[in-house]
Amino acid sequence: MPRVVCWHTLKSLNGYKNLSSGAETREGLRSSSPVDLPLRPRKQATAAGQRKLLSLQLLLCACTSVTDLTYWGPAGHGATAPHRSLLAIHLHLVPASSAAMKATGPHNAQTQVNPQGHAPSAEDPTGTWTVSGPCKDHPHPFLSQSNPPTRISSALPLKTDSALEQTPQQLPSLHLSQG
């Protein structure tokens, strides 16, 4: 069953050096083909310790779902350490969450949305939806639809397959001299 594991939790429980696999680094090993090494975790964290740290850090960092605690394969020649890969995943997820929080935060000057039934205020005396954008010359197409949807004019006759079969004289005919 998958568990949610955060990089901060792994760092706190296992330490930086214990995030790598049990595979040993062998100096001077040069081979063009990958070497099969047994993978085993260095240290398993207790579930209670994980829950405690996750409850404290859940709001502070983006987490990723993994099936087990950090089983890492052997790194290639010149590759970074496995805990740096996990750190890159963590740092990749955090800006997206920060951007989403800033976009909906109270200090965003571009878009202000008040929920339905909100108490009237100085900015919104009626207490209804208020959406203001940076381009007032070009209103939002979904919020300002003044024209009804375009309808097909009844003056244009629509021909079905049966109507085309009844009027074959209107279809151009090909002669052998044309082809």
From Swiss-Prot:
Q: What is one GO biological process annotated to this record?
A: regulation of DNA-templated transcription
What is a GO molecular function of this protein?
protein homodimerization activity
User: Where is it mostly found?
Assistant: nucleus
Name of the protein in its database record? Transcription factor NF-E4
In this chain, composition skew of type Polar residues spans 143-153, 163-179
Which region ranges are annotated with the description Disordered? 100-179
Q: Name one GO cellular component term.
A: protein-containing complex
Q: Which residues carry this modification: N6-acetyllysine?
A: 43
Subunit structure, as described in the record: Component of the SSP (stage selector protein) complex, which appears to be a heteromer of TFCP2 and 2 copies of NFE4. Interacts with HDAC1 and PCAF. Isoform 2 interacts with TFCP2.
User: Could you tell me where this protein is found in the cell?
Assistant: Nucleus
Q: Does the keyword Transcription regulation apply?
A: yes
* Position of the signal peptide: none
Alphabetical keyword list: Acetylation, Activator, Nucleus, Repressor, Transcription, Transcription regulation, Ubl conjugation
- PTM field: Acetylation at Lys-43 prolongs the protein half-life by preventing ubiquitin-mediated degradation and reduces the interaction between NF-E4 and HDAC1, potentially maximizing the activating ability of the factor at the gamma-promoter.
Q: What does this protein do?
A: Functions as part of the SSP (stage selector protein) complex, a complex that contributes to the preferential expression of the gamma-gene in fetal erythroid cells by facilitating the interaction of the gamma-globin genes with enhancer elements contained in the locus control region (LCR). The complex binds to the stage selector element (SSE) in the proximal gamma-globin promoter. In contrast, isoform 2 acts as a repressor of gamma-globin gene expression by preventing NFE2 and RNA polymerase II recruitment to the promoter.
- What is the gene name? NFE4
User: From which source organism is this entry?
Assistant: Homo sapiens (Human)
The record's account of tissue expression is: Specifically expressed in fetal liver, cord blood and bone marrow. Also expressed in the K562 and HEL cell lines, which constitutively express the fetal globin genes.
